[in-house]
């Protein structure tokens, strides 16, 4: 939804001023900003500006501003394969339970919550340290997932960082650079399993370490011995 309101000011003004209203854009679309201002974005990974062309890069909100004006752009996804888990690092178990109120709690331990999935979702799991959320993951059943749509959603939500071909893994970071994301593939027979794992970014690290992910991945049960290389290579061509 785009909206620019033209307002005529006092008689001493040479020309009418432009009032810039907040807008909503689909991811990967562009919009031309009216006027001659020089614009910048509060987060170029969500919405970038080149001249007067505004590009919706990834899902989220960014403030587009010039010397005299500003407005907020909200970027929305065009695909929806999975729902993100709770990523409020440090949150309590009660907060995560509230976030997951529409799902069935399968198992609760001192430092972990596991939820049953439905449809393509195998399960969702949360890890806690010092009573605060420290990791989250979802497992997806590839029999119910379009891999091209999954790749597209990953690029609409996250910034690709690295590929690990030996481990059938893709690494990402969120546009606010606060969360590291791993997409790992495995196969069990003809079924591809996708694990999407989230951990808070620590220090200056740009990717999650194997130590960060080991416990969460094992919870999903992605130790299947099959070879997902064909599907992995298909996704790699889309993601990188």
Locations of the language-model features?
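Short strand-edge motifs at loop-to-beta-strand transitions and within beta-strands
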Residues: 52-54
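Short helix/turn-capping signatures at newly exposed starts of structured segments
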Residues: 10-29, 44-45, 57-61, 67-159, ...
């Amino acid at each position: 939804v785009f909206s620019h309101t033209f307002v005529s000011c006092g008689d001493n003004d040479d020309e009418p001023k432009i009032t810039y209203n907040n807008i909503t854009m689909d991811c990967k679309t562009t919009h031309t900003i009216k006027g001659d201002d020089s614009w910048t974005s509060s987060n170029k990974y969500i919405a970038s500006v080149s001249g007067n062309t505004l590009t919706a890069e990834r899902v989220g909100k960014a403030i587009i501003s010039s010397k005299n004006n500003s407005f907020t752009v909200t970027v929305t996804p065009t695909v929806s394969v999975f729902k993100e888990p709770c990523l409020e690092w440090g949150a309590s178990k009660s907060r995560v339970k509230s976030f997951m109120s529409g799902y069935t709690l399968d198992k609760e331990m001192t430092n972990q919550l596991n939820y049953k999935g439905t449809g393509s979702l195998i399960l969702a799991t949360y890890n806690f340290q010092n009573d605060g959320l420290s990791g989250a993951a979802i497992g997806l059943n590839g029999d119910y997932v379009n891999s091209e749509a999954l790749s597209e959603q990953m690029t609409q939500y996250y910034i690709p960082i690295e590929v690990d071909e030996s481990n059938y893994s893709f690494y990402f970071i969120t546009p606010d650079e606060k969360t590291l994301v791993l997409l790992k593939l495995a196969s069990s027979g003809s079924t591809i399993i996708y694990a999407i794992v989230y951990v808070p970014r620590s220090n200056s690290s740009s990717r999650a370490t194997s130590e960060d992910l080991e416990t969460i991945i094992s919870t999903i049960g992605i130790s299947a011995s099959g070879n997902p290389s064909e599907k992995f290579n298909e996704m790699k061509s889309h993601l990188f």
